[in-house]
């Protein structure tokens, strides 16, 4: 019975996290962490490490799908990624010094806020408009944005997907598909750095079964989500992304309430 419960929880967590990653560039940690803590009793800091590890392959396969459809900006994304990686380690260390509850609430609020934003105020920027932004200005913005996102990534226990999506669309002026593609590309590396940092700082060996199941299920559903997202129109993608984020936000909020 305990094994069945573990499989079901990991399946649901992986499904939500994978679709969120592939469809909206959301970090798997925003969904997986509270699910593991609430229903399997895994310590929050260890759950964050498992969630970030699940993020790595899910983000990688999603970024490959977006890149194949020419919805990925590797050049500018790489600049942001360097600073994200540096500050991810700092944020991860600070997170280990704080209570569990401090780590969980931010992701939920950010997820629901972005969900509402995409429905009420959809991102309709075109690739042409995106490319017209001054290159030097974008480099400076990427550096400061990367530092902030990296710290939040390590601190909250998320790949920084929601923060990156918000900044890429609202601050750097990316069109939605390219923003999601670039976000998951960066998140592949931030999640890898964050998960290794969490496991090293935590010192305990994570539950291998839970880790394996979360990685597999998240990867499968991320692939499905990314393929659907790349075929959708911008208007439909905004609505679908908003709906998914709000639903996942409510589910995670419910999990936290049960806890």
Residue ranges and their predicted role:
Residues 18, 48-56, 180-191, 245:
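Transmembrane helix-bundle signature of multi-pass membrane transporters/permeases
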Residues 126, 158-163, 174-178:
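Short, structured loop/turn "capping" segments at alpha-beta junctions
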Residues 23-32, 157-167:
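Transmembrane helix boundary and interhelical junction motifs in multipass membrane proteins
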Residues 54, 182-199, 209-221:
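A small-residue-rich subset of transmembrane alpha-helices
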Residues 33, 53, 57, 112, ...:
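Alpha-helical transmembrane segments of polytopic integral membrane proteins
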Residues 42-50, 75-79, 173-184:
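Membrane-interface alpha-helices at helix entry/exit sites of multi-pass transporters
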Residues 1-19, 33, 37-39, 44, ...:
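Juxtamembrane transmembrane-helix boundary motif
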């Amino acid at each position: 019975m305990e094994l069945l419960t573990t499989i079901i929880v990991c399946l649901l967590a992986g499904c939500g996290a994978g679709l969120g990653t592939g469809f909206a560039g959301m970090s798997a940690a925003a969904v997986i962490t509270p699910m593991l803590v609430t229903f399997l009793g895994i310590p929050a800091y260890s759950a964050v490490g498992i969630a970030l590890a699940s993020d790595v392959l899910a983000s990688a396969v999603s970024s490959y799908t977006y890149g194949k459809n020419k919805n990925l900006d590797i050049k500018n994304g790489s600049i942001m990624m360097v600073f994200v990686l540096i500050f991810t380690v700092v944020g991860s260390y600070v997170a280990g010094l704080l209570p569990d509850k401090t780590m969980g609430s931010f992701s939920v609020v950010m997820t629901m806020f972005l969900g509402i934003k995409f429905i009420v105020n959809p991102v309709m920027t075109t690739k042409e408009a995106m490319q017209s932004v001054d290159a030097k200005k974008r480099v400076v913005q990427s550096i400061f944005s990367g530092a902030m996102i990296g710290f939040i990534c390590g601190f909250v226990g998320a790949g920084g997907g929601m923060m990156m999506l918000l900044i890429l669309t609202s601050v750097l002026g990316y069109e939605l598909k390219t923003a999601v593609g670039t976000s998951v590309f960066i998140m592949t590396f931030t999640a890898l750095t964050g998960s290794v940092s969490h496991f090293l700082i935590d010192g305990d060996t994570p539950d291998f079964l839970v880790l394996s199941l979360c990685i597999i299920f998240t990867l499968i559903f991320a692939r499905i989500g990314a393929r659907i997202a790349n075929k959708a129109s911008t208007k439909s993608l905004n609505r679908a992304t908003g709906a998914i984020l709000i639903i996942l936000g409510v589910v995670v909020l419910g999990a936290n309430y049960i806890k």
